[in-house]
Amino acid sequence: MAGHSKWANTKHRKERADHKKGKIFSRIIKELISAVKLGGADPKSNARLRMVIQKAKENNIPNENIERNLKKATSAEQKNFEEVTYELYGHGGVGIIVEAMTDNKNRTASDMRIAINKRGGSLVEPGSVLYNFARKGACTVAKSSIDEEVIFSYAIEAGAEDLDTEDEENFLVICAPSELASVKEKLISQGATCSEDRLIYLPLRLVDCDEKDGEANLALIDWLEQIEDVDDVYHNMS
């Protein structure tokens, strides 16, 4: 999620939006496998699995894909997925947070080191970058499903803190993490199509970059986003 960066031009935003669609599919499948590993393959007795299956259907993942991965998740050969967070500083003092979901932390760590060796930056101790960000809930809403003035009114009434534009096709409704489920439910009740709800990081302060550092950071972020296990990359570049 690039945020409001002067470096994120239209072409870059479009490429990232297209790439993000594939990431959503991949993340849901990993969440499904993790839910089965933790609570079993029966959605009737596994509330977490029920929620993930519903999310999969909302994102038009075919039933055969869901069934195939449910079967895959019950295999002893399939490892569980773990959530991992990496903090690093990019060029010009920009903070970057990388969230990944992986079944092999050594592989993911190796991919992170390769990205940094190729594009610069430095991994730092946990907490060194996080304090520059706030944890928020976010709901992606299709612009085609609801008018901007209407969604703003409903979102604020539902408990949202802000309404943003995620890309050309979607709004992004921001709220406190504890309000995410309630906000999503109320928006859906008003006809909005919510394709994804998740927790994100929003920068509390922005770092201004010169052109050289800005372009170098974009190259680093693009590389990080291409890592298979990585789900989201956040930064505080203005």
From Swiss-Prot:
Entry-linked SUPFAM superfamilies = YebC-like (SSF75625)
Q: Which HAMAP family match?
A: Transcrip_reg_TACO1 (MF_00693)
Q: Under which name does UniProt file this protein?
A: Probable transcriptional regulatory protein CPn_0573/CP_0176/CPj0573/CpB0595
Annotated region Disordered: the residues are 1-20
Family label: Belongs to the TACO1 family.
Question: Which key words tag this protein in UniProt?
Answer: Cytoplasm, DNA-binding, Transcription, Transcription regulation
- GO molecular function, a single term: DNA binding
- Which superkingdom? Bacteria
- Gene3D superfamilies, per the entry: 1.10.10.200, 3.30.70.980
List where Basic residues composition bias occurs.
9-20
List locations, semicolon-separated.
Cytoplasm
What does UniProt give as GO cellular component?
cytosol
Biological processes annotated in GO: regulation of DNA-templated transcription
